[in-house]
Amino acid sequence: MNPIFNLLPFSLKSLHFLMLLLGYLGLHSQVLTVRDSENLKPLDLVTIYSPKGNVSAVTNAQGQADISAFQDATVIMIQALGYAIENHSFGTLKQKEFILDLAPSQLELDQVVISASKWRQSSAKIPSKIVSISAQSVAFQNPQTAADLLELSGKVFVQKSQQGGGSPMIRGFATNRLLYSVDGVRMNTAIFRSGNIQNVISLDPLSMESTEVLLGPDAVIYGSDAIGGVMSFTTLKPQFSDSDKPLITGGAMTRFSTANREGSVHADVKVGWKNWGFLSSTTLTQYDDLIQGSNGPQDYLRPYYVARYQGQDIIVPHKNPRRQGPSGYGQTNSLHKIHFRPNEHWDLSYALHYSQTTSYSRYDRHLRTKDGSPRYGQWDYGPQSWMMNHLSVNHKKSHGPYSEMALRLALQNFEESRISRAFNEPVRENRTENVAAYSANLDFAKNLSPNSSLYYGVEWVLNDVNSQGENTNILSHISTPGPSRYPQAKWLSYGAYGSLQHQISKALMLQSGLRYNGIKLDATFDTSFYPLPFEKAQIDTGNWTGNFGLVLNPGRQWLLRANYATAFRAPNVDDLGKIFDSEPGAVVVPNHQLKPEYAHSWDLGTAKIINKKLKIDVSTYYTRLKNAMVRRDFSLNGAQFIPYDGELSRVQAIQNAATAYIYGLQAGFELKLPAGFELTSDFNYQKGEEEMNDGNKSPSRHV
């Protein structure tokens, strides 16, 4: 017998009270079940969203979600990958007894995205082009790393200097001109360099709920660095139970790949009650040396490798020149979350992200030679680690200065190092960088009217950079201090923004925003190893950025979008203060006179669905980057060449070029074929030029 009957005397009065109570509970805890219309199986990860009320929910493994908060919503959008989008009112769902069957879709122009404003929005009402990669696509495509995951979009080019690499490029921009966001938290640090970076491999593709790539600037929401685009990663979330019984779900997989003898093991588990949810996800991966394809370039073949024998470096012939050794490495990823939802208004969660690789060799450096012998006996990236503690608080209300609020507090710790030793030289150089990144984001969404929404917020980010150098004699095992790669530095960013979305008419949407961002940098240099003409450098600057865009959507089969946006990137510690060998015979030195670079970007795109079978998408863009920071020849105390790492090297520095121009075209199509097959293709063309000091133009590097 239900315990509630034991608490109430059985009488007409108490029965009336009981009916009111059950009616109240049904009113305030209404569960929607979403199923596949063909096999009636429950659908998980279905997004339920109200465009007018900024209310959202996601179905659990049983295809269920509590939609009590949607009672006042006039339109409820329900979307799942591979299914037709449906719009209903709460009353319509009630008539269906809160059971909804979704039909497999053909093609759609509309989807729910987060990256444009950090809130769930309809992509058909956003003037920027956004590409989404779902967890189902990841499970089907099986990318080994998060860099490979981004390539699934067809819009991101990924450069790799070694197997343990992956440096994305979007619309001609790369490295620190792109912004990485994990669960709404900025991942970029003050030492994200202008050269190729591999920080994205710290993320686990198997723990992603969704990944979005926003093409073009979005500095209004994200601040500095968001010039070429934004990569927004949303990790797995705990699920809640809709009954008194705990909801327990999970999954596991193993994978083996022949090209690099990869062995991966992954497991995740979710345990949820009505108000509490827990999640744990772990992936262990080991990669052996990568085997090059039989039709690969001759320059990348490895006819020999270096081994240590009786205190000497020796050259050992490779039995298989296509084996790119050394290039193997291992990696561990783990994610743990605690989620507490006391009621429909408040939502609190804590997440611990952790990733660490083993040491891995930089393959292109091992291909270099000097006087007929290998240039290096060792050139490794040391273990790359990333840890993030993330606390988020969300609140929803129907009245007041906001409809929904999100507070994100995060502490990230990054460590990376470079270990190198010349061939048959006893001294091994080790340069280690540690960055502690503190951040606080407070974001709001407010429904001003049925046709207007306002998004606004503030951000504060502090990076504490600690850089150390050490030289070790591998014969005597004696270590001495060595030159560091960076100065000791603190980098501060603070900003405030506002963005308005207004439905001008049924077919026309306007979106416009404005942001102010301040940047401060304080660096102290060690001049005991290099004769720098300064010991301290400071930057204190600020920039206004904005955007104005229109979306014309005459119907669900066609849309046009146009957007103008500005963006900026302030010099970070890597731009201003690093000392490193950029290429054979060249050394980059600090330049304390750097200024921010500023971008103006124009974007025009269209998408069309033909006969519900063919989707065509075309976008063109043009970006002008003023004061672009690029590497150029430089002088140090009047000297154009200085000795570095035992070699006389040309002095270079990051400098503000006159202007850089980037333009391009992106096109793609998606064709639905019989029997569930699908054909897709993407085309990307981009060109970048920068003005030299003498007025001539040259191709841009990393732009």
Place the predicted regions along the sequence by residue:
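N-terminal periplasmic accessory domains that precede
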Residues: 96-101, 146-149, 166-169, 181, ...
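Transmembrane beta-barrel wall of Gram-negative outer-membrane proteins
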Residues: 260-287, 296-359, 385-387, 448-449, ...
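Gram-negative outer-membrane beta-barrel transporters
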Residues: 505-506, 510, 519, 621-624, ...
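Signature of Gram-negative outer-membrane beta-barrel scaffolds
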Residues: 454-558, 570, 580-583, 694-695
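Short acidic/polar hinge/loop motifs at secondary-structure boundaries
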Residues: 187-217, 334
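Flexible loop and strand-edge segments within Gram-negative outer membrane beta-barrel domains
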Residues: 325-331, 341-402, 413-435, 482-488, ...
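Short, acidic, small-residue-rich periplasmic hinge/interaction motif at the N-terminus
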Residues: 35-39, 46-51, 79-83, 95-139, ...
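Outer-membrane beta-barrel signature, preferentially recognizing the C-terminal barrel domain
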Residues: 258, 376-398, 485-491, 535-553, ...
